[in-house]
Amino acid sequence: MDAAGVAAKPSLSRKPSPSFRLRNGSLNALRLRRVFDLFDRNGDGEITLDEMASALDALGLGADRAGLEATVGGYIPAGAAGLRFGDFEALHRALGDALFGPVEEEEPGKQGEDDDEGDMKEAFRVFDEDGDGFISAAELQAVLKKLGLPEARNLATVQEMICNVDRDCDGRVDFGEFKCMMQGITVWGA
């Protein structure tokens, strides 16, 4: 309430949600590619409206079919059965702009290492579920399971994934190891 006793209206932030758009283009493209691949159930390179509806239902975000068609239909090219990855990126960008405003373009070189570091830390925290500063095989397995990835079924496979980036051989991934791994990822088509 303000001084006159009137309840203040909540203000909506126009900044992008850090969970919706990452500042680091490579991380954002990688995340979008993973989401695209999960939504594309049959692996044909297109997300149909049925696949989109199923994915949203699985996430607990059931969408009205007519509303989904109205929102997504304009991004499906003529003659295509569904969204290709580029179309999916355009839809994601348009939704982000509509919900949070357009991304402010920065001068080349101005986007500092602070932004990249912040994105890396945010991504690390997704995996470090207990907040102890390390990603254990159990934590990685839990995240892979939430993403519906088949690697989550076998703990030995998950432990091998950990070993591939665990430079100090302590059986878990610290932030430095995570950062090196993420910086070594090449995103094709990004």
From Swiss-Prot:
Domain of life: Eukaryota
Chain sites annotated for binding Ca(2+) 1: D40, N42, D44, E46, E51
Keyword Repeat found: yes
Keyword Transport attributed: no
Entry binding sites for Ca(2+) 2: D128, D130, D132, E139
InterPro entries cross-referenced by the UniProt entry: EF-hand-dom_pair, EF_Hand_1_Ca_BS, EF_hand_dom, EF_hand_pair_protein_CML-like
Membrane-spanning parts: none
Residues holding Ca(2+) 3: D166, D168, D170, R172, E177
One GO MF term: calcium ion binding
Residue ranges of domain EF-hand in the record: 27-62, 115-150, 153-188
Cited Pfam families: EF-hand_6, EF-hand_7
Its biological purpose: Potential calcium sensor.
Entry-linked PANTHER family: EF-HAND CALCIUM-BINDING DOMAIN CONTAINING PROTEIN
Descriptive protein name: Probable calcium-binding protein CML27
Species in which this protein is naturally found: Oryza sativa subsp. japonica (Rice)
